[in-house]
From Swiss-Prot:
Keyword DNA-binding belongs to the record: no
Biological process (GO), any one: DNA replication
Reported cofactor(s): Mg(2+); Mn(2+)
Organism of origin: Haemophilus influenzae (strain PittGG)
Role: DNA ligase that catalyzes the formation of phosphodiester linkages between 5'-phosphoryl and 3'-hydroxyl groups in double-stranded DNA using NAD as a coenzyme and as the energy source for the reaction. It is essential for DNA replication and repair of damaged DNA.
Keywords annotated in UniProt: DNA damage, DNA repair, DNA replication, Ligase, Magnesium, Manganese, Metal-binding, NAD, Zinc
List of residues binding NAD(+): 32-36, 81-82, 114, 137, 174, 291, 315
Gene field: ligA
Reactions accelerated catalytically: NAD(+) + (deoxyribonucleotide)n-3'-hydroxyl + 5'-phospho-(deoxyribonucleotide)m = (deoxyribonucleotide)n+m + AMP + beta-nicotinamide D-nucleotide
Domain named BRCT: residues: 592-670
Protein name stated in the entry: DNA ligase
Binding site for Zn(2+): 409, 412, 427, 433
InterPro entries according to UniProt: BRCT_dom, BRCT_dom_sf, DisA/LigA_HHH, DNA_ligase, DNA_ligase_AS, DNA_ligase_CS, DNAligase_adenylation, DNAligase_N
A single GO molecular function term of this UniProt record: DNA binding
């Protein structure tokens, strides 16, 4: 063997080991960059020395020419289906049949239990350790030749990881697409105006049956082995579980959830455990496969028709069903998001009766090409809200009606706007819309907004539920009699709440802007808006170009602000707030280049009386300062409010400049 051949063999062996660690053990020993480096090194050597290229090289997963069609492969050992059980009673009957048939009955019966993967069954033949042929299950006797496509699946070894491979070994398993890969695939398809897949199983099937293996290579497919067909030149373990572990040891991936269970009760416990974990597995399963573990007992039990007597699929309740779309209603969420909800002919899916399903947004309606009256496929997985995943367009009736997305909010009649680049359309009546009322009011009274002590979430809930308030302005119209009629609201608590409301009328423009709850407008942005426009009227009248002159206000935020002020309902509520006495003094802040704090480290301590701590922090950051939470020798200034404690003492000890709140305000305002 030449030095080049030795180098090639060593590279291939190393890369196969890394692939095994990554795809089978899920425990890579090297970073991806090291694998990539060796892979490219191998590829370059093979290009220089094509006479030494082998079909089982890690570089040869992709590269076959597109096929004109699939040839047929006859299975030497038929790929049988399984009988199904749909209840504990049916499973127990299966166990009873086994017990009645066995001459010497072991106590207890041991089962190898596996999740039933929702993918496609395949057969992969290795000759002297090299992947030689792969086929679909087909009708059990004959399948399609998918060798070129199977070679592209990253966790399928092209050569078995053993120095003593069997002469012939047929691995049987399921090819599927994990949820994460499925979502990436559909996202890419949407971005490139390509057809999307209804579910991961369809995506896996479509990918495996691609005539062009280069396309299959870009699909995130995975194999999990579940058994062995042909085995020549090897002494196999005597139990099903040990055979799967042996497959894993030679590089074939198996499912990590496989478990040995003794007796029917343990098996049923496994079934329920997997059912509970179903939504968090990261891939689709539709039940469990339960097999007698002892191979000798399997052989004794034998087969009936097209199924083994020693195994059964205990299926979960169906997750997908067909039903009719009777109507579509548009709901308004607490943040103003408009969600189309399908009203369905009730249908039993995954253990519950489903009559509603989400349609997500306008894009989804368009993608599905769905109309009222259509026959639709409903899917319910775990605790996930039922959704429509497909439409049987060939069943569309002549009287089907198109779904029209509303232009005005179905709750408050405010305009509905969809910002470019966003999937969700929203009601613009944030201060007025009843659907958004509770959240808008809770935000309005919060500490960082109007800071109304004594008026918390529970009180807001009561006031809204009893229809005593509808907008933030109504808070300032409350009286003692109204409040004392509420649950857990005595005279003292009511007086405190009213005093807090009265005190809150004196605020700052920045706090007021933040309290309005304009989407994407946080504390710092509100402060920037107040400093830039100086008055509420100037902000209200600003156009998009003027809004984008404000620091940290880009196109999206500018759109949010502009749309808010163009909705008449919002303007009416703001005017009502001013009429109720909400006011502020104009405080004009110096530009960053003119102030003392640019590029300085500042610590805030104690209670500030004229603004909140976060407001002061945002203001300092706007002026170019770094705000720290602790005092050190690197601190330039400490701003001390009332009841300043250890930070003030440490600043004095380190001879750091200390400013009172009044001195701080004098430094930053003109």
């Amino acid at each position: 063997m030449t030095n080049i051949q030795t180098q090639l063999d060593n590279l291939r062996k190393t890369l196969r080991q890394y692939e095994y660690e990554y795809h089978v053990l899920d425990n890579p020993s090297v970073p991806d960059s090291e694998y990539d480096r060796l892979f490219h090194q191998l590829k370059a050597l093979e290009l220089e020395h094509p006479e030494f290229l082998t079909s089982d090289s890690p570089t040869q997963r992709v590269g076959a020419k597109p096929l004109s069609g699939f040839s047929q492969i006859r299975h030497e050992i038929p790929m049988l289906s399984l009988d199904n059980a749909f209840s504990d009673t049916e499973f127990n009957a299966f166990v009873k049949r086994i017990e009645d048939r066995l001459i010497l009955l072991p106590k207890p019966l041991t089962f190898c239990c596996e999740p039933k993967l929702d993918g496609l069954a395949v057969s992969i033949l290795y000759v002297n350790g090299v992947l030689t042929q792969a086929a679909t299950r087909g009708d059990g006797s004959t399948g399609e030749d998918i060798t070129a496509n199977i070679r592209t699946i990253r966790n399928v070894p092209l050569q078995l990881l053993t120095d003593n491979p069997p002469a012939r070994l047929e691995v049987r398993g399921e090819v599927f697409m994990p949820h994460a890969g499925f979502e990436r695939l559909n996202k890419y398809a949407l971005e490139h105006n390509e057809k999307t897949f209804a579910n991961p199983r369809n995506a896996a099937a479509g990918s495996l049956r691609q005539l062009d293996p280069n396309i299959t290579s870009k699909r995130p497919l995975v194999l999990n082995a579940y058994g062995i067909g042909i085995a020549e030149g090897v002494d196999l373990p005597t139990t099903h579980y040990d055979r799967l572990q042996w497959l894993k040891s030679i590089g074939i991936p198996v499912n990590p959830e496989i478990r040995l269970c003794n007796g029917a009760d343990e098996v049923l416990g496994f079934y329920r455990d997997i059912q509970n974990k179903r939504s968090s597995l990261g891939y689709d399963i539709d039940g469990t496969v339960l097999k007698i573990n002892d191979i000798a007992l399997q052989n004794e039990l034998g087969f009936i028709s097209k199924a083994p007597r020693w195994a059964i699929a205990y299926k979960f309740p169906a997750q997908e069903e067909l039903t009719l779309l009777n109507d579509v209603e548009f709901q308004v969420g607490r943040t103003g998001a408009i969600t189309p909800v399908a009203k369905l002919e009730p249908v039993f899916v995954a253990g519950v009766t489903v009559s509603n399903a989400t349609l997500h947004n306008g894009d989804e309606i368009e993608r599905l090409n769905i109309a009222i009256g259509d026959t639709v496929v409903i899917r319910r997985a775990g605790d996930v809200i039922p959704q429509i995943i497909g439409v049987l367009h060939e069943r569309r009736p002549d009287n089907a009606k198109p779904i029209i997305f509303p232009t005005n909010c179905p709750v408050c009649d405010s305009q509905i706007i969809r910002i470019e680049g966003e999937a969700v359309a929203r009601c613009t009546g944030g201060l007025f819309c009843a659907a958004q009322r509770k959240e808008a009011l809770k935000h309005f009274v919060s500490r960082k907004a109007m800071d109304i002590d004594g008026v918390g979430g529970k009180l807001i809930e009561q006031l809204v539920d009893r229809e005593l308030i509808h907008t933030p302005a109504d808070l300032f119209k409350l009286d003692l009699t109204t409040l004392t009629r509420l649950e857990r609201m005595g005279a003292k608590s009511a007086e405190n709440a009213l005093n807090s409301l009265e005190n809150a009328k004196s605020t700052t423009l920045a706090r007021f802007i933040f309290a309005l709850g304009i989407r994407e407008v946080g504390e710092a942005t509100a402060l920037n808006l107040a400093n830039h426009f100086k008055t509420l009227d100037a902000l209200k009248d600003a156009n998009l170009e003027e809004l984008q002159q404000v620091p940290d206000v880009g196109e999206v935020v500018a759109n949010r602000i502009f749309i808010f002020w163009r909705e008449a309902h919002n303007v009416a509520v703001v005017e009502d707030l001013i009429a109720q006495g909400v006011h502020w003094e104009t405080v004009e802040v110096k530009e960053a280049s003119e102030n003392l704090f640019k590029d300085k480290t500042v610590v805030l301590t104690g209670t500030l009386t004229q603004m909140g701590r976060n407001e002061a922090k945002a203001l300092l950051q706007q002026l170019g300062a770094k705000v720290s939470g602790s005092v050190s020798s690197k601190t330039d200034f400490v701003i001390a409010g009332d009841a300043a404690g250890s930070k003030l003492a440490k600043a004095q000890e380190l001879n750091i400049t200390v400013l009172t709140e009044e001195e701080f305000l004098a430094q930053i305002t003109r």
